Amino acid sequence: MLKPSDTWSWYYDNKAQSLMLDLGMDMVFCVNLSPKVLINSAFDDCKFSVDDASAYQMFVEHISYLPLSEPRKVELALNCVAARRFHKPMLPKSWFFETQGAGYYPEEGEIVSLKNDLGEGHFIIVENYECASMCMLVDMDAFALNPTKYMAFCEPIKVMNDRMAKMQVVNSSYYALVG
């Protein structure tokens, strides 16, 4: 697994129109966030901070059991760090999902289940607010929000916490704990 370094740095690539993370040794990671959702500081060069490294390690630990390849796990963890640090505040889009029970407060890095009439998706909590959380799709397959709108791997969305169910790991598979 890729280990964070104090030589890593964030920068915005105008040509690619994307936030990038320079990993050194001629390796660059392209963040999966649209420029229109980035806060102003995302367009300035800055170091990969101690907080970024701590968040990266936390996300890596929480996704270790997911049925993803190592490169995909790194991609997911780095996109989580970027969204946590550089994503503009957003309003919840809870109407896409069914209520699964009140009183659930997920922790950052936790894997949760979100359901609707079209299926069930698995998401990682990027940031937890009082009643809602920004989460990111961890499934490789697209998740249908409605018949015409789909989410892709590593795409973020903010959802009310009552739409989420905690996940339980059984032999590297995950299941929702409801009730």
Swiss-Prot record:
InterPro entries in UniProt: ZapC, ZapC_C, ZapC_N
Subcellular location: Cytoplasm
Pfam hit, one: ZapC_N
Keywords: Cell cycle, Cell division, Cytoplasm, Septation
Record carries keyword Ribonucleoprotein: no
Statement: the UniProt record of this protein carries the keyword DNA damage: no
A GO CC term attached to the entry: cytoplasm
Gene Ontology process terms (BP): division septum assembly; FtsZ-dependent cytokinesis
Major site of localization recorded for this protein: cytoplasm
Matching HAMAP family: ZapC
Assembly behavior: Interacts directly with FtsZ.
Family of the protein in this entry: Belongs to the ZapC family.
Function: Contributes to the efficiency of the cell division process by stabilizing the polymeric form of the cell division protein FtsZ. Acts by promoting interactions between FtsZ protofilaments and suppressing the GTPase activity of FtsZ.
Protein name: Cell division protein ZapC
Source species taxonomy: Bacteria, Pseudomonadati, Pseudomonadota, Gammaproteobacteria, Vibrionales
